[in-house]
Each structure stands twice: as structure tokens, then as C-alpha cells.
From Swiss-Prot:
Inhibited by 2-oxo-dADP and 8-oxo-dGDP. Changing residue 53 to P: Loss of activity. InterPro entries: 8ODP (IPR003563), Nudix_hydrolase (IPR020476), NUDIX_hydrolase-like_dom_sf (IPR015797), NUDIX_hydrolase_CS (IPR020084), NUDIX_hydrolase_dom (IPR000086). SUPFAM superfamilies: Nudix. 2-oxo-dATP binds at residues 8, 33, 35-38, 117-120. Optimum pH is 7.8-8.2 with 8-oxo-dGTP as substrate, and 8.0-8.5 with 2-oxo-dATP as substrate. This is Oxidized purine nucleoside triphosphate hydrolase. It comes from Homo sapiens (Human). Changing residue 37 to F: Loss of activity. N(6)-methyl-AMP binds at residues 8, 23, 117-120.
Length: 156
């Protein structure tokens, strides 16, 4: 395993629904996902999360709550992805489509796991139960999980 790069992922959760975005281009295109991306140099992880949410959905947030950290390894890729997962229920604005993402609300019992990253079905239930977690997923390509660990933690 080599060096890692910081990424963010923000899930907008309301009592009966979650906001996901259909990735329109680039890494993960064609999948529903939360909003996020690379943390830029000189930016805190939380600032990066806020920026990515605003760029990809038009939303601004009052408060972000860090709920998880997942390290992804993709066979053949030199860098690990160190993804910091946040959730929020306090948003301002209306979700709007961007060049990268098409936002859509989903009822919590209708989350489209078959059209999401395969690892989401492992950790999303913890997120919905307001539990904090650490995870590691090793992928072959973008569809096959070769190995993983996932555990609940008290603090992220």
C-alpha cells in the first residue's frame, strides 16, 4: 500500500429521506453517491466537504457531523483513498444539478443500492442508525470487493 489522498463524502439526511447525486462524469460515473471529492491543499477536511457539497448540489450547510472514515484500495492504483464521511440535516437552498451530479431525494426504504458503490450497502445501515464507523475496502476494478473490514467506533 502506498500514500493516501484525502477525500470527503457528505450525506444529507432528513427524517425519512436521503439526498444522493447521480455521478455524471469521471470516477464513479453512472452511480448514485453522496457529495464530495478531493480535499484541496490548505483546506481543512470539513471545509473541503462543505465546498464539494456546494459545488455539486448548490446546497450550503450549517453543521456537518463526522460519522465515518473509510480507506479504499483499488488494485493497481498507487494511492489509497482516505474518505471522511459526514452527514448533515441542516441545509440551506434547493438541490440543483451541476456538471458533475444530478441530485435526487430517496426515501430511506428505497435507497438504490444496486446503482451505488458496492461497499455502500455495508456501511450505510450504520450511518442511518447514527453510529460512527471505520472501514477498509479493497476493490478489484469498481465492482468487486476483494476484502474489507468495518467496525463501529466511539469517535471518528
Amino acid at each position: 500500500m502506498g500514500a493516501s489522498r484525502l477525500y470527503t463524502l457528505v450525506l444529507v439526511l432528513q427524517p425519512q429521506r436521503v439526498l444522493l447525486g447521480m455521478k455524471k462524469r469521471g470516477f464513479g460515473a453512472g452511480r448514485w453517491n453522496g457529495f464530495g471529492g478531493k480535499v484541496q491543499e490548505g483546506e481543512t477536511i470539513e471545509d473541503g466537504a462543505r465546498r464539494e457539497l456546494q459545488e455539486e448540489s448548490g446546497l450550503t450547510v450549517d453543521a456537518l457531523h463526522k460519522v465515518g472514515q473509510i480507506v479504499f484500495e483499488f488494485v493497481g492504483e498507487p494511492e489509497l483513498m482516505d474518505v471522511h464521511v459526514f452527514c448533515t440535516d441542516s441545509i440551506q437552498g434547493t438541490p440543483v444539478e451541476s456538471d458533475e451530479m444530478r441530485p435526487c431525494w430517496f426515501q430511506l426504504d428505497q435507497i438504490p443500492f444496486k446503482d451505488m458503490w458496492p461497499d455502500d450497502s455495508y456501511w450505510f445501515p450504520l450511518l442511518l442508525q447514527k453510529k460512527k464507523f471505520h472501514g477498509y475496502f479493497k476493490f478489484q476494478g469498481q465492482d468487486t470487493i476483494l476484502d474489507y473490514t468495518l467496525r463501529e467506533v466511539d469517535t471518528v
